[in-house]
């Protein structure tokens, strides 16, 4: 029996489904987390062979001892994953220390975590990216901004999501940024005029896709976080060929094997000198894990399938026979607490209840980017989806 160590299997809350499908495939699933065992979902507890509680997952020594304990008790660990951006570097360090060769090692982390290092691999894939500057002095940053023109975007070179990400529109805003920024390495990029689209896939051991999908985010996540806007994004009914092509070239260039990926691109909404023409695909950043929150469930709703099983099949068998059913648009809307929406919950359910797949409160840890109350709805046409979004975000 193969041993799979799952780091923080309780977060996000839907990740118990990954553990359940691993168990169904004959894997011994060993959990490590800082949530008390009795507070784990019953479905998660029944999926785990054993759970090792640490006082804090932030304490590397504690987590190391947990993996060492499982190694002593059950033998060599075959897989170790969290499927969580926050722990990717921790996962890689543990794999390296325990000689677990089924995933990224510490030496791989620079190219998959640092936005500046990603640029060379996008170039290798033949995909253009925004010009950039690693922030050091105010004068050098000012010269870069003058070269590419305001606005510019600044964000941590190694960061999660849209945290600490800003659009700067003038020298004065740049000066304020330097006076108030955190003591981390920032990257500054020219502003790309485009809509974010993604290539989301489960990749096998030879770089082959076992499942492919994608989503579109009409609004900037940076703006959603910084301005507390509603969060909207949707799973595409059919993955455009140009996005699929860019995704697979990126997978090959980055050497991705045996994992879930969420690769972000821009589709240009206007011609942009040095980048391309309207409609061209531009590299944004790679995320070597599933798209966040409840997006895995949205793939299932959109394609009448089960990505938790497909992923677990990839781990256990390096293939999957799980079928894809009818295809739909699956539209997420995250509303904000306290805002006066024209349609209250009852009106929303009366109008869209037939296609509503999920609704409920979003965990506070995700609410900055995803809103406070989520509605996830299947729709069959783009026109129906656009009407749904108009109704969902309209205020009184």
Would you name each region that the model predicts?
Residues 1-105, 319, 382-395:
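ATP-binding N-terminal substructure of ATP-dependent carboxylate-amine bond-forming enzymes
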Residues 51-58, 133-137, 166-169:
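Short acidic-hydrophobic, aromatic-tinged amphipathic segments that line or gate anion-handling sites
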Residues 62, 140-141, 173:
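Short acidic active-site motifs
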Residues 128-130, 151-154, 163-198, 220-231, ...:
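Conserved ATP-binding module of the ATP-grasp superfamily
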Residues 190-256, 260, 267-271, 275-278, ...:
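ATP-dependent carboxylate/phosphate-activation module, predominantly the ATP-grasp catalytic core
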Residues 310-396:
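Peripheral (often C-terminal) accessory segments that flank ATP-dependent C-N-forming ligase machineries
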């Amino acid at each position: 029996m193969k041993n799979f160590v799952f780091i923080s299997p309780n977060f996000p809350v839907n990740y118990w489904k990954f553990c359940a499908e691993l168990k169904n495939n004959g894997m011994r699933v060993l959990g490590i987390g800082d949530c008390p065992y009795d507070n784990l979902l019953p479905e998660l507890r029944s999926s785990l062979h054993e759970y090792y509680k640490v006082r804090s997952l932030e304490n590397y020594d504690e987590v190391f001892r947990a993996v060492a304990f499982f190694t002593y008790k059950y033998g060599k660990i075959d897989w170790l994953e969290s499927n969580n951006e926050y722990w990717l570097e921790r996962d890689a360090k543990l794999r390296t220390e325990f000689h677990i060769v089924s995933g990224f090692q510490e030496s791989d982390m620079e190219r998959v975590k640092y936005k500046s290092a990603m640029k060379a691999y996008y170039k290798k894939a033949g995909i253009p990216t925004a010009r950039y500057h690693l922030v050091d002095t105010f004068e050098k940053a000012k010269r870069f901004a003058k070269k590419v023109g305001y606005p510019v975007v600044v964000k941590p070179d190694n960061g999660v999501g849209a945290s600490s990400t800003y659009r700067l529109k003038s020298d004065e805003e740049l000066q304020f940024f330097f006076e108030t920024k955190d003591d981390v390495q920032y990257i500054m990029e020219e502003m790309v005029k485009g809509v974010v689209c993604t290539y989301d896939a489960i990749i096998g051991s030879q770089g082959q896709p076992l499942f492919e999908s994608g989503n579109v985010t009409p609004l900037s996540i940076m703006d959603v976080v910084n301005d507390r806007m509603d969060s909207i994004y949707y799973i595409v009914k059919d993955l455009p060929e140009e996005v699929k092509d860019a995704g697979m070239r990126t997978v090959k260039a980055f050497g991705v094997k045996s994992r879930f990926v969420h690769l972000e691109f821009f589709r240009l909404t206007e011609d942009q000198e040095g980048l391309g023409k309207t409609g061209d695909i531009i590299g944004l950043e790679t995320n070597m894990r599933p798209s966040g929150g409840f997006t895995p469930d949205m793939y299932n709703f959109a394609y009448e399938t089960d990505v938790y099983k497909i992923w677990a099949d990839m781990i256990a068998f390096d293939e999957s026979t799980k079928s894809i059913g009818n295809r739909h648009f699956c539209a997420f809307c995250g509303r904000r607490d306290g805002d006066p929406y024209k349609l209250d919950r009852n009106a929303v359910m009366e109008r869209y209840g037939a296609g509503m797949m999920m609704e409920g409160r979003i965990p506070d840890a995700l609410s900055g980017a995803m809103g406070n109350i989520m509605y996830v709805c299947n729709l069959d046409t783009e026109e129906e989806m656009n009407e749904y979004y108009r109704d969902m975000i309209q205020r009184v």
